């Protein structure tokens, strides 16, 4: 297995990203307990532009224990090419784990532009900057580098009452959000096939767990029940969805 030394986590102040950083440092985001599941001893650079869904308070314990030593935060938009290039060079990044994304379906319907900018152009900026930074003089890539792209199962469309998605399921995005993620997936795979960029990609289902923004379905349902408010019904209410606990998702990402 490659020895990971300097990991760039995009969107690390968001829900899944902040939980992943906790996981890397052996801190359970649920109860603060220590565990050493990841067995990671390197450095983490968290790049996040702190939109409404980003919250550095989620990483207060990480900052207190590792800030300035093994954990570093950079408030940077992933579309900012010069800043991304600076970070790659300054921290000698060998691994990028790309969580950063606009991810709320309803918001994508009301304002799709931000989703195209972040999810498509931001991913392109990261891929191209990494390609240039990791490329050796002979055109091949360093053998210690990897770009992992986090995607969603929504790129496959909607399931019926039976069946399941697989790696060979055709893409069938149905919203500006899922379309933007499908686009970023194709760009990522193009960099793998065209340039040979060391790359892995995962398409995960819905996550739930600590630090989740309250607009998401499970915390929204729970808060509405608590406050005696009506529960939202999407479409006819017959859509099938599943969820995975965020720490289980992050274990899978680390295994990949």
Question: Where are the language model's segments positioned?
Answer:
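N-terminal Rossmann-like NAD(P)+-binding domain of SDR-like oxidoreductases, especially those catalyzing
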Residues: 1-207, 247
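Glycine-rich "substrate-gating" loop/helix at the edge of Rossmann-like oxidoreductase active sites
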Residues: 174, 205-215, 235-247
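A glycine/serine/threonine-rich, flexible loop-to-helix segment
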Residues: 163, 214-222
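Alpha-helical substrate-binding/gating segment
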Residues: 193, 219-231, 241-256
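Short, hydrophobic secondary-structure boundary micro-motifs
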Residues: 139, 232-235
């Amino acid at each position: 297995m490659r020895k990971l030394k300097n990991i760039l986590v995009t969107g690390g102040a968001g829900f899944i990203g902040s939980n992943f950083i906790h996981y890397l440092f052996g801190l359970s985001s649920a109860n603060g307990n220590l565990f050493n599941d990841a067995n990671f001893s390197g450095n983490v650079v968290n790049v996040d532009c702190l939109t409404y869904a980003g919250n550095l308070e989620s990483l207060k314990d990480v900052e207190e224990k590792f800030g300035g030593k093994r954990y570093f935060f950079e408030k940077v938009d992933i579309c900012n090419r010069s800043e991304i290039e600076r970070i790659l060079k300054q921290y000698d990044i060998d691994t990028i784990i790309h969580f950063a994304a606009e991810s709320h379906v309803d918001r994508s319907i009301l304002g799709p532009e931000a989703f195209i900018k972040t999810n498509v152009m931001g991913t392109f900026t990261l891929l191209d900057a990494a390609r240039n930074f990791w490329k050796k003089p002979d055109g091949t890539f360093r053998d210690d580098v990897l770009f992992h792209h986090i995607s969603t199962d929504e790129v496959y469309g909607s399931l019926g009452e039976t069946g399941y998605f697989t790696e060979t399921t055709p893409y069938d995005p149905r919203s500006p959000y899922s379309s933007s993620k499908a686009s970023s997936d194709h760009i990522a795979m193009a960099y793998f096939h065209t340039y040979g960029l060391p790359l892995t990609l995962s398409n995960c289902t819905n996550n739930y767990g600590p630090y989740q923004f309250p607009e998401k379905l499970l915390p929204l349902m729970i808060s509405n029940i608590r406050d005696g408010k009506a529960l939202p019904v999407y479409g006819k209410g017959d859509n099938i969805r599943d969820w995975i606990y965020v720490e289980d998702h992050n274990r899978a990402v680390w295994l990949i």
